Amino acid sequence: MNISVPEAALRLGKSQATIRRLLAGGQIAGQKVGGRWIVHAEKLPHLPSVSTAAGADRPRIDVRLALRQLRRTDIRDLWVPDVLKWEDYAQEPSEVLAAAQAKCSTGQSDEVIVVNIPKGPHLSRAGSLLSLEDRIAYHALCATFAEKAERRLSDRVYSSRLNANQRAGLFKSGIDQWKKFNETTNREVRTAGPWMAKTDLVSYFETISHKVLFEELTLLQVPEDIKRPLRELLRGWRFETQHGIPIGPDASRLLGNIFMMRVDETMLDEGWNYWRYMDDIRIIANSEREVVRALRRLEVLCRTRGLLLSSPKTKVGEYPMGEATDDDSLDLADYFFRNGLDEARKAIRKILHSSLLDKSIKTRHARFALVRLGALVDRAVLAKILRRLDRLKEASPESALYLRSFISETALQQEITAYLAGPGEPGVEEYQQAWLLAAMLEVLGDPPREWIIYAWRITQDANNPSYLRNLAANLVALGKDPEHLAWLRKTAIENYNPALVRGTLVALARAGELRQPIVDSAVSRHTQLRCTAEYLRSRASLPSLIQVGLWSRVREVSNT
């Protein structure tokens, strides 16, 4: 009996592109008729098939595993710092897990806060701050079909590949996968090149069509009772456009891979030497004409899905053997750093200097250097970083990590005060404000009065997002001004916003001013804060909002 390539793919749990490559290599029995492969079903290897029965059991939704995985990835690397790094919910997770479990059935979403993340000197991208309950539900729902997606993904795709040890995280290390992507394509261009096209997609996560995405999930045989709440969550977060998925969560990375599967399979099926890491794509050929043909074909395929290639980021060129790349300099500096060699400081400083030469900084290089120079407590670049804070806004978390080592020094405090007071329109980005406030909370002794006044103004502006007001409230509390403390108490007791109440409870605890009647009143109105109250009662000190474990932060600097 003969069957089609899609049917063989379903039976073997592999992608259609993989089936075609196995047919071409003689590893699966079949023949090509009229330019299309047919598969000899009776000669297929006996591998477990993917169940297509209408009555198949619903995949198990594991919200507890989702929280464990999120603590290792998403929650540790949020766009802006949380006042407790969500440790209160991790310590007493029962209520938040129950709420997340309910969302996995209803799809009812909480309000999403958009953080404008600087991208270049003038533009931004929309980072999504989901509630913890929403984030857990989103992750748990998507995790139910992660294995199906993994089986269908081509081995030419390196982004967001499933981790064999699910307790350690949903995906393999993004850093390791990015390095493999670079190493593999660099080897490939030396043997199958020398021409390579490099391109990426414009605002990829923000342009994903929900309609097309759910068509792909249907083809992947995701059950309707998983798709329905997932669809409702995405609608709730993006109700205005029905396009876009949250930037940041691992769940979105999984959906991002699924959305590109059809493009991957078509490019590979047509014989193009194609490689992908999420929205970064490379095509290799032995002539300029051939690589441009492939690029044009990719452009057409992406356009049919509502995606656009970035013209400024599309590069076509010859890559001769032995040519050094930016990644080579990063790898060498990282080798010096990890092995404690004297050359480390000089090499990493050089990377930082080169990242700041142009008006638009090399963000990845700046982030790489700042984290490592912070680990080395390298004072030599301090003055340069303070002078360039306005240009380092894209690397705000890493800048804060570096500055925290010197945050109690009077000279540095004066420089930060001047910077906060200095910019005219449009002023300091909220994203950078949040990370600077987190660094200011690391100060030993009393913060400068100017910082308290600055933070107080932020708390009093109801138009500011709650995450920013909460961070500012914690700095205000350290000033122990009676008027400010009275406002914190009143907010904790009377405010209707549980996020703001949580922030003020933490602020009062930070100042040693949290009293039981205030806690009782807050929890009676916002029962979900019971875990916060228990956490604060059991702690003699609060966690650093920057120091996630310096070595792990060094390990996790993103390559995208």
Residue ranges and their predicted role:
Residues 1-16:
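Polyanion-binding surface elements
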Residues 4-6, 27-51:
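Short helix-start
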